[in-house]
Amino acid sequence: MKRTFQPSVLKRNRTHGFRARMATKNGRQVLARRRAKGRKSLSA
């Protein structure tokens, strides 16, 4: 049986990376929430 998680750094960054978050209004809201919460790491 094939596992569902097949890691790829490029895919990870393109979907969850900082620049991907900054590209949309909602993504910027995600970063703002994580900053407000005090997350050490904002994005992948």
UniProtKB/Swiss-Prot annotation:
Pfam families recorded: Ribosomal_L34
Gene Ontology BP, a term: translation
Keyword Ribosomal protein recorded: yes
GO molecular function: structural constituent of ribosome
Cystine pairs: none
Residue runs in coiled coils: none
Keyword field contains Ribonucleoprotein: yes
GO cellular component terms attached to this protein's record: ribonucleoprotein complex; ribosome
Keywords assigned by UniProt, alphabetized: Ribonucleoprotein, Ribosomal protein
Entry-linked InterPro entries: Ribosomal_bL34, Ribosomal_bL34_CS
HAMAP family with a match to the protein in the record: Ribosomal_bL34
Family from the record: Belongs to the bacterial ribosomal protein bL34 family.
Family annotation (PANTHER family): LARGE RIBOSOMAL SUBUNIT PROTEIN BL34M, MITOCHONDRIAL RIBOSOMAL PROTEIN 34 FAMILY MEMBER
Name this polypeptide is given: Large ribosomal subunit protein bL34
